[in-house]
Design a protein with these regions (language model features):
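Helix-loop-helix hairpin linking two adjacent transmembrane segments in secondary transporters
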Residues: 145-195
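Cytoplasmic membrane-interface "Motif A"-like loop-to-helix N-cap segments
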Residues: 78-89, 284-298
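Juxtamembrane intracellular "pre-TM" segments in multi-pass secondary transporters
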Residues: 2-12, 194-227
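C-terminal transmembrane helical hairpin of 12-TM major facilitator-type secondary transporters
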Residues: 288-341
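Extracytoplasmic gate region of multi-pass secondary transporters
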Residues: 36-37, 222-276, 335, 339
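Cytoplasmic helix-loop-helix junction between adjacent transmembrane helices
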Residues: 111-151
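Residue-level signature of mid-helix packing/kink "hotspots" within the transmembrane helices
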Residues: 34, 62-70, 153-154, 268-272, ...
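Conserved MFS/SLC helix-loop-helix module at the cytosolic interface between two early adjacent transmembrane helices
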Residues: 67-106
């Protein structure tokens, strides 16, 4: 770990105020991007989609994220976070507006993927902001910022699903996209990059040869590569839970659509608390040992996934909700620890591109995971086979994380 070249905070601005704007932007980006999970049932009914096709919607979003992650990380290392907050809000909002007025499934997938480019730009943009503004309590700050992802997802389930039931999913999504664009303008107006993050010419001119050199360095960094592959499993498992918990509860456990939607809210709210709690735990109890914390998260998630397979039809809502709450706390709470681990494994000046690299690799988990889970359920006719598949993936994740920790310890 080499973070010796740290940026001194800009004394006249409160870093927590800047964190507030990053959090607001993150909430709204997730509010739109993660709306595919709660709206998936209604979109599927409207377009007559199979479960595997519904799973392709978040997969397309994260395909866009994987395409954007490294270029976004490279650009934010050069121009800072402020302008990108505006650009990504309009990119995501505009693409989802076009998606909302189409009835062609393949055009919908294309617009979701283009929106994913804006969605994927948010993580390197906000991660760089956290690294610039926080030298202490960075795990806590990152957890608070990452809480915006699950909070935005929970709000989309809590607000967009009832609105979509009343107005139709298209009108509800159009209104939400307009709100995202307005938030992007406000974030651009009030967020500040510290002076040390400002671009300096000619040092900050974008060089594609330097980009290729930087990407090559990321691929040669074995602990970062192993962490990123492990993140594929963690991210895929998280999106499987978010994408299918409503369908699972509605179709297999017999809950109403409203109560099934509430399970997604519970999962995401629990994940929001998890992101902050795991950040505090990693800063205090584990003294910054992020990889070990990720091992604990994966192990707990395996236990909960196996417990889900034992839930009988007709079980009470509150019994299901308690299981889903713990599941969400773990599998939706890992992201801040992942981002901290990735950026702290590399020199500070490479933090943006390291974020982009690990997101690019990790995004393939959510591109492959939900459609594969849906295919397993379509083939078997039983969600339990899907949950067994998720447990096996997380077991492999633990092996990768322990390997990455061993290599990182050797390097230090």
């Amino acid at each position: 770990m080499d973070n010796s070249t740290l940026v001194k905070p800009f004394k006249s601005i409160n870093p927590w105020h800047m964190l507030g704007w990053l959090l607001v932007a993150q909430v709204m980006v997730a509010f739109i991007g993660r709306s595919l999970a709660p709206l998936g049932v209604l979109i599927g009914q409207d377009l007559a989609l199979t479960k595997a096709q519904i799973g392709m919607l978040p997969a397309a979003l994260f395909l866009g994220q994987s395409i954007a992650s490294i270029p976004a990380g490279f650009i934010v290392d050069r121009i800072g976070s402020k302008r990108l907050l505006l650009y990504l809000s309009f990119g995501l909002g505009g693409a989802f507006m076009l998606m909302a007025i189409s009835s062609n499934y393949f055009f919908v997938l294309l617009m979701v993927a283009i929106g994913g480019i804006g969605y994927g730009t948010m993580h390197p943009t906000s991660n760089k902001g956290i690294l610039h503004w926080f030298q202490q309590k960075r795990g806590t700050a990152m957890g608070i910022k990452q809480m915006g992802v699950t909070l935005g997802s929970a709000l989309s389930a809590l607000l967009l699903l009832p609105l979509a039931a009343a107005w139709g999913w298209r009108m509800a999504l159009l209104a939400a996209c307009a709100l995202l664009m307005a938030t992007g303008v406000l974030a651009y107006r009030f967020y500040r990059d510290p002076p040390s993050a400002e671009p300096h010419e000619p040092e900050r001119k974008i060089s594609w040869s330097y980009l290729k050199e930087s990407i090559g360095a990321m691929f040669r960094h074995k602990p970062l590569v192993l962490l990123s592959i492990a993140a594929m499993g963690l991210s895929g498992s998280q999106l499987i839970l978010n994408t299918y918990i409503v369908l699972f509860a509605y179709e297999q456990l017999g809950l109403s659509l409203l109560l099934a939607g509430m399970l997604l809210v519970i999962s995401e709210v629990s994940g929001s608390f998890g992101r902050v709690a795991w950040g505090i735990i990693s800063d205090t109890i584990f003294k910054g040992q992020r990889l070990i914390v990720l091992v604990y998260i994966a192990a707990l998630s395996i236990g909960i996934a196996l417990m889900v397979t034992q839930l009988p039809e007709g079980i009470s809502f509150w019994a299901i909700a308690s299981v889903v709450a713990v599941f969400g706390f773990c599998i939706s709470g890992f992201n801040g620890i992942w981002m901290n681990a990735a950026t702290e494994l590399v020199p500070f000046k490479q933090a943006g591109i390291a974020s982009g690299f690990t997101l690019m690799v990790g995004s393939w988990g959510v591109i492959i995971g939900p459609p594969l889970f849906g295919y397993i359920v379509d083939l078997s006719g039983d969600f339990n086979y899907g949950w067994f598949f998720l447990s096996f993936v997380l077991l492999f994740v633990i092996v990768l994380l322990l390997w990455a920790k061993r290599l990182a310890n050797k390097e230090t």
